[in-house]
Amino acid sequence: MDIKQTAVAGSLESSDLMITVSPNDEQTITITLDSSVEKQFGNHIRQLIHQTLVNLKVTAAKVEAVDKGALDCTIQARTIAAVHRAAGIDQYDWKEIDSWNV
């Protein structure tokens, strides 16, 4: 999926995550995380965001995430929403997304 513009999903409310996805000219995925639970779960959150991007076939993006204690399902949903907005796609392939849940 090609990231064309900057897009945001989520909020800074408790138990949520605000994620910003932007194009990356370096053709890599970079993830910046600000989390109150970074020492405990930072690596897991980064890995979950990265895997979601891979599942969406994103090869180049700058991602900034501000976590306020979001669950995995929320992190994944916010990432999916931000990527689709950044790519300018308003249709979701629910069968494909459901196939990730093995």
From Swiss-Prot:
Coiled coil: none annotated. The keyword Cell membrane does not apply. GO terms for cellular component: cytoplasm. Its main location: cytoplasm. The keyword Phosphoprotein applies. Keywords: Cytoplasm, Phosphoprotein. It is found in: Cytoplasm. The modification O-(phosphoribosyl dephospho-coenzyme A)serine is found at residue 14. Covalent carrier of the coenzyme of citrate lyase. Belongs to the CitD family. Oligomer with a subunit composition of (alpha,beta,gamma)6. This is Citrate lyase acyl carrier protein. It comes from Streptococcus pyogenes serotype M1.
